[in-house]
Amino acid sequence: MFDAAHRLERYKGKCEKLHGHTYRVRVTVVGTPDEEGMVIDFVELKQLVNEKVLALLDHSYLNEIMPQPTAENIARWIWDRLEPVLKTEKRRLYEVTVWETADSFVSYRGEGHEGRTESEGQ
């Protein structure tokens, strides 16, 4: 999880104003388990996510890090930072999911795949 502020430029609505969220991130890696029976050690995965993503995004102003920081663009930004360091002969990054609220999230699976946005109404 990380806390950050942003605003959506060129957007007509309340999100064009400066506001913040507590974002939740899920990173999914697929591949062939190693001799220990793991696709990737949770310790290694958490360390990479902390170093490459959370250390940069937590308590930041996202507009200074990426253009138009929608949940979709945040997921893609995270993908672009993690995909090269997670890819090996036996594993690869499969999906990045970002929750902007408890019931609104997006998933990204890289270039050539459609993104997915979901929200549960209340």
Stretch-by-stretch model annotation:
Residues M1-Q122:
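Charge-rich, low-complexity N-terminal segments
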